[in-house]
């Protein structure tokens, strides 16, 4: 299908193309922001600038149910909605240029991967998780601050209150366990570092479920946007109150589904990640660290009326920590074997540096010493 046919199908009508000076200004601004925001990821300002300058950028009429900007990989073009203001243009330009940077295609131009989103897998999931990652990074690059907002009867904290607020709030919860480096690296370089790191902090079933839930949230938010648009059209001088009532009912139902998926995802992150860390506790100091980490997680919690899951989980964990404390006081530190298995972090393939082998040898030494100590006790 040709680009013109694709644009027509998407409902995008070009108004005008940004000139070379306008594109160069955007490219200079974005390359500087990305370099400053993510200095540890080996980005080259000059290369970024030249690469972004190759993009075609357009102002266009966009459908109401579409995002305010869209990147098309087939013709390396970004289309900005004519309805957006200049402030949104700055953030969305970073967002769409990140999509451009993370694009991986084969020699025939077929799209293989966009950051976290791997199109070569059978499940073809991860699109929404990647969108959230890109939006999070765009917000960081434009110096957006954490803000507490309300959506669908939920109160949440995000640096992106206007674009993907729920997804970025949930992503912050995931990064609480992985740190930001794996996410940024996978988003920029299209690899599985973030995925493998999160799996190491939880399990593969948990990651897959979260990935699916992000896609579901994206799907239902699109449906919600469509229904809200229908309501705005129907409300303009309409006397068909039954139709308006039906649309409002569908809107309420979709909001409830979004709330349920969000809380289910949050609970999945909470339970599986902290249970994994609980199993890694070996010393009394580990218990203190775990307790502090569990307590501070409350600052990331997406809350709503009658949501008590975190408080109940916290209480349950405190009881389990007390059991761990009593065991350590009675028998000494817990074996390092399980901890070793959980703590070996996943790193990108073919990047086994000196530090990695140094840490590996250290952990192997710990295992050997632990086994020798166990044999001495048996004697």
Question: What does each model-identified segment do?
Answer:
Residues 1-5, 134, 346, 354, ...:
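Non-Sec secretion/translocation targeting segments of pathogen effectors
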Residues 8, 153-323, 327, 331-334:
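Pan-zinc metallopeptidase signature
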Residues 11-87, 107:
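Auxiliary, metal-adjacent structural segments of Zn-dependent hydrolase domains
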Residues 20-32, 39, 66, 123, ...:
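Low-complexity, repetitive regions of proteins mediating host interaction that are extracellular
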Residues 91-107, 135, 139:
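Active-site recognition of the HExxH zinc-binding catalytic motif
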Residues 97, 104-123:
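Nucleic-acid nuclease catalytic cores
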Residues 117-163:
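Post-HExxH zinc-binding segment in Zn-dependent metallohydrolases
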Residues 333-342, 349:
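Charge-dense, extended regions
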